[in-house]
């Protein structure tokens, strides 16, 4: 039997009516799952039981949390479909056909763990890729913390204005655009004119932290885009979004997860203050003196996370692979144990 024949039989089997073995019982797939996707990156899967159907959303490495196109049970396995539009062009570059290629992720639960298989046809429709990966159930969220009762330790200056000794790239194989200029932490990911694209790196603290308050100042020039990752897991967006409608991708939002309650960003080119508190998987963001996220729960990692495991300490990391950016006065105060 050829690989293509097995692939065709696999998809045929998914559309044959079947009775879920767990029908009538609590569905063990419902909940939130931290994924370690093929290649070791961070992902996330959320499965919900709606009135008469299953639904879900997924984060695959970078980008945003997106709705799954189709979620259903096949016997005791969970199937998650994502559909990808592929444009077919002729020799002149004109689009002559748009196809929809399916990608399926099949999951098998074992207690609090998932074994998953991703099957995706090649874009030339010859053969397919099959990848194995794993998931772990995310524990229920703790109760919303009473921040007035949280005790903090001594402040730590993460950036001393003189060196990058307390920092390193998240990927040492990438090029660094980061430097210290006049006491400021500056990123300049300059691309060569007409040359090959250079992959610039993100900057992280050498030290790792649990819960904390983080204060910093950032100057976002026109069109610039960065981000502040809490414990390397949750991105608080830094971007030139002044005057735009409220969106989770805007300045101060938790990227694709939590939309600010009010637009508090300043016009491009001005220094802005961020005051971020992370306690018990709840986050508060004060931007330029205005509270825009108030002790909201974090449902999982965001795109670009170093890890999907929310139980571990992690670094502060600053996104530097997009555009230039400038930071100063980065002070972290840990929660006292």
Regions found by a protein language model. Name each.
Residues 1-6:
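N-terminal secretory signal peptides that target proteins for export/translocation
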Residues 8-19:
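Bacterial N-terminal signal peptides
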Residues 24-337:
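Carbohydrate-interacting regions of secretory-pathway proteins
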